[in-house]
């Protein structure tokens, strides 16, 4: 199979439909992970999956798992934990720390992490540009001091939030962060959350599968529409419990 090599001076991607037709979803390979290439990738439903020997591999997945914020489902056991209220959720309080924890988290059936140092640097750049955001769940420890317990990060373009990775140091911490983040993002105007892959974890939150063509059309429309206000850095209240 011939793998498309992406030009260093051109951020355009081949049509993901061709990669999906081959079943593997590999759209192309690049020698860089520039912010401009990352943003162009997300706008087209493409994301970097891993790197090898200095090359970055870009994929598209279809059908695409997504969460529509107005259809968010909170599992009963998690709703009970949320009502307990012993946690605190914030956005963009410690982005670099969240990414580092995601990189260090053990994953089933994975040897190591795809979030290599080059990826961490790239997403930190997107964070500095106002595109990448982290949601953090904090719990009090035995001394009563509040500490980071879990969270996730992703990229926001227009009214789409592209989820990337989660971690949890305490049970349910990443789930709490997600359950609070979705209504918060919806209030700001986010209409679609990209989960990339279909997993049991996201199905519990009501994720749905979209044909890639439908997903890509939604991106085309929603990426161009700005949020009602910037995500910023603040506390996030859990709503609708």
Curated annotation (Swiss-Prot):
What are the GO cellular component annotations?
Answer: cytoplasm
Q: Where in the cell does this protein reside?
A: Cytoplasm
Pfam families in alphabetical order: Leu_Phe_trans
Catalytic reaction list: N-terminal L-lysyl-[protein] + L-leucyl-tRNA(Leu) = N-terminal L-leucyl-L-lysyl-[protein] + tRNA(Leu) + H(+); N-terminal L-arginyl-[protein] + L-leucyl-tRNA(Leu) = N-terminal L-leucyl-L-arginyl-[protein] + tRNA(Leu) + H(+); L-phenylalanyl-tRNA(Phe) + an N-terminal L-alpha-aminoacyl-[protein] = an N-terminal L-phenylalanyl-L-alpha-aminoacyl-[protein] + tRNA(Phe)
Any GO MF annotation of the entry:
leucyl-tRNA--protein transferase activity
* Top-rank taxon, per record: Bacteria
Q: Which UniProt keywords apply?
A: Acyltransferase, Cytoplasm, Transferase
Q: Which GO terms describe its biological process?
A: protein catabolic process
EC id: 2.3.2.6
The cross-references to NCBIfam families, in alphabetical order and at most eight, read:
aat
Please report which protein family the annotation says this sequence is part of. Answer: Belongs to the L/F-transferase family.
**Biological role stated in the UniProt entry:** Functions in the N-end rule pathway of protein degradation where it conjugates Leu, Phe and, less efficiently, Met from aminoacyl-tRNAs to the N-termini of proteins containing an N-terminal arginine or lysine.
Name of the protein in question:
Leucyl/phenylalanyl-tRNA--protein transferase
UniProt source species: Neisseria meningitidis serogroup B (strain ATCC BAA-335 / MC58)
What lineage does the source organism belong to? Bacteria, Pseudomonadati, Pseudomonadota, Betaproteobacteria, Neisseriales
UniProt gene name: aat
